[in-house]
């Protein structure tokens, strides 16, 4: 949200794809954004099966894929778990069933860790920027799986020198595309959140 509020939107045309466009930060988004509805397959991939949003988007096909992921992940052996974590396993199963975005972009930014795979696999853009908001060593991810995705990105951004070091340790051959972009603090967002907290405690 802070990144979007910091951009000079009068100079750019910005599309925003959000899994939950009615989320808690919806009112803090700047004017001028164009919202792109996520495909139902993408929602079903990321939303838990016991949530209402899953059932609002589900089809017989996506229900079968979801159940396959759940049961398949439980049944995976040691070799499979060494190649990919459950998030990466889910992506490997779902990616062939999720449609590509029809529009071509100058730049595509995956601002959340879980969307890195989507941007690489399903978005057509001249440049692609991925994000890692945490110390990679503390994430339940297998570097060997992510290596092919990071290789296709123009930049992989993270939020601190500590997080950068963890990326370099895991992807030493890609240090030229790894970069720190510290968290952006928007005064407007901070004030809005403070007002929200005051209302909740008030």
Where are these regions (language model features)?
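Donor nucleotide-sugar binding/catalytic pocket of nucleotide-sugar-dependent glycosyltransferases
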Residues: 127-133, 137, 151-192
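Short His-centered aromatic/hydrophobic patch
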Residues: 70-74, 90, 109-115
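N-terminal strand-loop element at the rim of the active site
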Residues: 11-81
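A short, glycine/small-residue-rich beta-strand->loop->alpha-helix junction that serves as a flexible
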Residues: 1
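Short N-terminal targeting/anchoring amphipathic segment
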Residues: 82-87, 96-113, 129
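A short, histidine- and acid-enriched strand-loop-helix "catalytic/donor-clamping" loop
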Residues: 114-118, 125-142
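Membrane-proximal helix-turn-helix segments that form the acceptor-binding/catalytic region
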Residues: 92-105, 135-159, 163
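A short helix/loop element that forms part of the nucleotide-sugar donor recognition site in Leloir-type
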Residues: 96, 190-202
